[in-house]
């Protein structure tokens, strides 16, 4: 399916995703220990979970701009070094404020990842493969979340939660050195394969970034991605604490059980891009966005219903099953948001527009965890938080049907006709 010279790029990007969520999930797994050691309330813990997304969301956009200007390879190298160092710095936290600051800086480091992956895929692969490649590379993230539970949980119980953050830092720094040494920005055959690999627009076209930032297709794709991230951050940050605090599980049991949704998420994200590309090939006459919307709306709506009901069931097994299925359907859409941007944006702007979309989407990571902590403190239960996450995603999936459409026309001063209407 993919040529041998491109497989290392896929592997490195996949492993970057694994490390990304190994780092990011570690705090959630270690949260019961950290809360006790630093004497933090649920509201304070929610603010710490949210603080990550303050730096993360801002650098989603700035990282995308940097990947367009300085190249995805260099941008991702710097990002990995920064986030690995601040992952290790979590072990130095001595209170609420210090941990809050470290998590903001850690989020800044992780921010450029998705936009740089999107840019690298755009550099290396033709449009017919991009959703599949994005799905495969991004599937590393739920796998990282899956292995984070057992690894961090066992290390925290056997040694200390601080040790796990130092080990994860070392893994990230090793990846950064190998990435910089072995991966190229673009394939050597780019010139020969230019008609297949580059975006539909020609190099001479100058379409301003602001043209895309005002398009409903970009804005409502970002809104759907916001709903996706609201569910994801709810699961990522609070689900371990929900199992321990509301369901009464031990940290050891929680560490094992959290693997189940992540494994289904890994399968969903890896398969989602292939499903979208397959639907596209079968419905090509209806346009590429039709296939993206079919997968996105169906799966996001299903995820929303499942997560909403998960907070209402009486048994732990039922709640875990519904959350796991919700994560599976959620991750089936994971590659689609990026594929939509690939489909409607020219090559010169794809990193920046993707970063802008990701920035808007990840404000959910600022709002969601803090709001969940507040809801839990006020009500003493997670039920309302589950229902809010599901309701938001239902609304977003319906908005996609109405507003995500091909971008027809061109901004004033460009030469191409309908450059992004395919």
Curated annotation (Swiss-Prot):
Where in the cell does this protein reside?
A: Cell membrane
The transmembrane segments are 9-29, 45-65, 82-102, 141-161, 163-183, 219-239, 256-276, 294-314, 321-341, 356-376, 381-401
The organism's superkingdom is given as Bacteria
Chief location category: membrane
Q: Which Pfam families match?
A: MFS_1
Name the CDD domains for this protein.
MFS_ExuT_GudP_like
Induction and repression of expression = Induced by galacturonate, repressed by glucose.
- The chain's coiled-coil residues are none
Query: What is the recorded membrane topology of this protein?
Result: Multi-pass membrane protein
Catalysed reactions, as listed in the record: aldehydo-D-glucuronate(in) + H(+)(in) = aldehydo-D-glucuronate(out) + H(+)(out); aldehydo-D-galacturonate(out) + H(+)(out) = aldehydo-D-galacturonate(in) + H(+)(in)
A Gene Ontology MF term for this entry? transmembrane transporter activity
PROSITE patterns on file = MFS
Entry's Gene3D superfamilies? MFS general substrate transporter like domains
UniProt GO cellular component terms: plasma membrane
The record's keywords, sorted A to Z, are:
Cell membrane, Membrane, Transmembrane, Transmembrane helix, Transport
Q: List other remarks.
A: Member of the exu locus which is required for galacturonate utilization.
Q: What does this protein do?
A: Transport of aldohexuronates such as D-glucuronate and D-galacturonate.
Family under the similarity heading: Belongs to the major facilitator superfamily. Phthalate permease family.
Q: What is this protein called?
A: Hexuronate transporter
């Amino acid at each position: 399916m993919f040529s041998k010279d491109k497989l290392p790029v896929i592997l490195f990007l996949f492993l970057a995703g694994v490390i990304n969520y190994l780092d990011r999930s570690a705090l959630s797994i270690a949260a019961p220990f950290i809360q006790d050691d630093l004497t933090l309330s649920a509201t304070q813990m929610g603010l710490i979970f949210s603080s990550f997304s303050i730096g993360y969301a801002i650098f989603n956009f700035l990282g995308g701009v940097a990947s367009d200007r300085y190249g995805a390879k260099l941008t991702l190298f710097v990002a990995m070094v920064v986030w690995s160092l601040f992952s290790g710095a979590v072990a130095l936290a001595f209170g609420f404020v210090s941990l809050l600051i470290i998590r903001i800086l850690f989020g800044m480091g992780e921010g450029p990842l998705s936009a740089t992956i999107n840019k690298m895929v755009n550099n290396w692969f033709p449009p017919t493969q991009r959703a599949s490649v994005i799905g495969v590379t991004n599937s590393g993230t739920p796998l990282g979340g899956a292995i984070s539970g057992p690894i961090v949980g066992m290390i925290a119980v056997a040694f200390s939660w601080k040790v796990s953050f130092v080990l994860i830092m070392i893994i990230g720094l090793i990846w950064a050195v190998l990435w910089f040494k072995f991966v190229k920005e673009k394939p050597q055959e780019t010139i020969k394969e230019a008609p297949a690999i580059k975006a539909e627009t020609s190099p001479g076209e100058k379409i301003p970034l602001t043209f895309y930032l005002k398009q409903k297709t970009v804005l409502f794709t970002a809104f759907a991605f916001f709903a996706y991230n609201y569910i994801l951050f709810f699961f990522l940050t609070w689900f371990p604490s929900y199992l321990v605090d509301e369901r009464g599980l031990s940290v050891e049991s929680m560490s094992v059980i959290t693997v189940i949704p992540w494994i289904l998420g890994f399968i969903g994200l890896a398969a989602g891009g292939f499903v979208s590309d397959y639907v596209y090939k079968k419905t090509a006459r209806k346009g590429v966005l039709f296939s993206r919307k079919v997968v996105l709306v169906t799966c996001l709506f299903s995820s929303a219903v499942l997560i909403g009901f998960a907070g209402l069931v009486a048994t732990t097994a039922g709640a875990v099953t519904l959350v796991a299925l919700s994560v599976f359907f959620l991750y089936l859409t994971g590659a689609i948001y990026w594929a939509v941007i690939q489909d409607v944006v020219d090559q010169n702007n794809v990193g920046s527009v993707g970063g802008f979309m990701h920035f808007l989407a990840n404000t959910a990571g600022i709002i969601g965890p803090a709001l969940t902590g507040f809801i839990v403190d006020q009500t003493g239960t997670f039920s309302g938080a589950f229902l809010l996450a599901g309701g938001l995603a239902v609304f977003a999936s319906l908005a996609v049907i109405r507003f995500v459409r091909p971008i027809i026309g061109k901004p004033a001063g460009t030469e191409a006709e309908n450059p992004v209407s395919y």
